[in-house]
């Protein structure tokens, strides 16, 4: 981090010459995002003193000491806005974070047992978030690590590229559901915990706990398990509350500097919307591809206007169904809003935008298996409207083979100097059942270069070892 810097320049003028002293003291405070502003506060003192001189009766010398303080005042960092995506036409394998390849380590170097990983980025860094069970592998606390909700779960993070071990991880708050985002100046962290019938959303801005939001349907209030989205200092968070096998209506919270300033109630097809993966289609619109856990294998698709703070939900019309389990592609008949069959159950899906000057690309991920959380493929559709376009999405490569686990997936964008890099992350779960540890690796694919997606990802973990 870079600083407010104070420089004091003292110039002593004497009859015999010039003595220049420069005193510099610097302290680091925050990141410099634009040119330094200068402010001068002059201090002038002019004492008179008599100098020894051979002919003192005829000469009087005056020493004038002039002091000028120059104070460098740094501006606050700027709010972030979505930019055009960096150039590229395909995604490639960028990174694998497979903590349990280091499972022989003990103590502070032991990998944490985690699930629901996601990544969020600020102007200068990305953080890898997850929900831990407050246990490590190896260890003696494996019981309960397959549970979604309990009193031990916490939202943690490491710098992207670090392994989430005991010593590397920052524990942000108690939470069994989470999100986070950076507004350009500071991190906003979201955690949900509490009893199923009365869960609570907690907000942390930087190091301060700033606000809460209470359950409105008394049925597992929860959030998106991926990054929230910020523009001009306003951050938008998707939440939902309701039955996993019935009605669960979502809302959006508009948050500024850690405090809720508005609730947004979507209209349209609102029966069940959860675990949305959201991003900016433009400076005006946030779009989200979500999960319906009860009625359909199509993804509910949200459009949120950040100028009017209004949101509408409809089902995606494409014949490429993105949830798991799902029926055969193209088998659902009727209008776009038809639910079809095999709608029970679901999975969070990856979604990210490629913003270009003349068009927009929407990239999605789905499991290779129609019935199991195995494998992960990448798809893309340029331009058009997800609410009305019934065409199939174009397959763009295999990120995880059908022999490997492919659970939740999510989107995020890395900030380059002049553009944003779209990426998709995949949760690869080591499912040991209820008798042993249950944790995850994270595979990351990002837009870079041209050609075809070349290689899939494996975790390299054998739970029997």
From Swiss-Prot:
This is Neuraminidase. It comes from Influenza B virus (strain B/Memphis/6/1986). Residues 38-85 are annotated as: Hypervariable stalk region. Residues 1-11 are intravirion. The active site is at residues 148, 408. The lineage of its organism: Viruses, Riboviria, Orthornavirae, Negarnaviricota, Polyploviricotina. The gene is NA. It is a single-pass type II membrane protein. Residues 35-465 are virion surface. One of its GO terms (biological process) is viral budding from plasma membrane. Its EC number is 3.2.1.18. SUPFAM superfamilies: Sialidases (SSF50939). Inhibited by the neuraminidase inhibitors zanamivir (Relenza) and oseltamivir (Tamiflu). These drugs interfere with the release of progeny virus from infected cells and are effective against all influenza strains. Resistance to neuraminidase inhibitors is quite rare. Belongs to the glycosyl hydrolase 34 family.
């Amino acid at each position: 981090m870079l600083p407010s810097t104070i420089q004091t320049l003292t110039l002593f003028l004497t009859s015999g010459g010039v003595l220049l002293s420069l005193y510099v003291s610097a302290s680091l405070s925050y990141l410099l995002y634009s040119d330094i502003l200068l402010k001068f506060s002059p201090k002038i003192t002019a004492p008179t003193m008599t100098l020894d001189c051979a002919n003192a009766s005829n000469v009087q010398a005056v020493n004038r000491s002039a002091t000028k303080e120059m104070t460098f005042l740094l501006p606050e960092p700027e709010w972030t806005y979505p930019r055009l995506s960096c150039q590229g036409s395909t995604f490639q394998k960028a990174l694998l974070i497979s903590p349990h390849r280091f499972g022989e380590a003990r103590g502070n170097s032991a990998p944490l047992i985690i699930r629901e990983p996601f990544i969020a980025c600020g102007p200068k860094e990305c953080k890898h978030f997850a929900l831990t069970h407050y246990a490590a592998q190896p260890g003696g606390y494996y019981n309960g690590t397959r549970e979604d909700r309990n009193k031990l779960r916490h939202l943690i993070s490491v710098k992207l590229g670090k392994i989430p071990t005991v010593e590397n991880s920052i524990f942000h708050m108690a939470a069994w559901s989470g999100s986070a985002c950076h507004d350009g100046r500071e991190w906003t962290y979201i955690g949900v915990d509490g009893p199923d019938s009365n869960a609570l959303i907690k907000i942390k801005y930087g190091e301060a706990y700033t606000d809460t939001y209470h359950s409105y349907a008394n049925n597992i209030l929860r959030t998106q398990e991926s990054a929230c989205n910020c523009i001009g200092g306003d951050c938008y968070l998707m939440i939902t509350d309701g039955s996993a096998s019935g009605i669960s209506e979502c809302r959006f919270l508009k948050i500024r500097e850690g405090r809720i300033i508005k609730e947004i109630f979507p209209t349209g097809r609102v029966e069940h919307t959860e675990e949305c993966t959201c991003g900016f289609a433009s400076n005006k619109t946030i779009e989200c591809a979500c999960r319906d856990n009860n009625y359909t294998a199509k993804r509910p698709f949200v459009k949120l206007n950040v100028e009017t703070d209004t949101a509408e939900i409809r089902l995606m019309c494409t014949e490429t169904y993105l949830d798991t389990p799902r029926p055969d592609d193209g088998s659902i008949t009727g209008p776009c809003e038809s639910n079809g069959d095999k709608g029970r159950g679901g999975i969070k899906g990856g979604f990210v935008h490629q913003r270009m000057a003349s068009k927009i690309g929407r990239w999605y991920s789905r499991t290779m298996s129609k019935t199991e959380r195995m494998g992960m493929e990448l798809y893309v559709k340029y331009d058009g409207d997800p609410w009305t376009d019934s065409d199939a999405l174009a397959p763009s490569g295999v990120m995880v083979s059908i022999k490997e686990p492919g659970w939740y997936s999510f989107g995020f964008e890395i900030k380059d100097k002049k553009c944003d890099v779209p990426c998709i992350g995949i949760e690869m779960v080591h499912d040991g059942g209820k008798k042993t540890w249950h944790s995850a690796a994270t595979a990351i694919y990002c837009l870079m270069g041209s050609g075809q997606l070349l290689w899939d990802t494996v975790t390299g973990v054998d739970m029997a070892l």
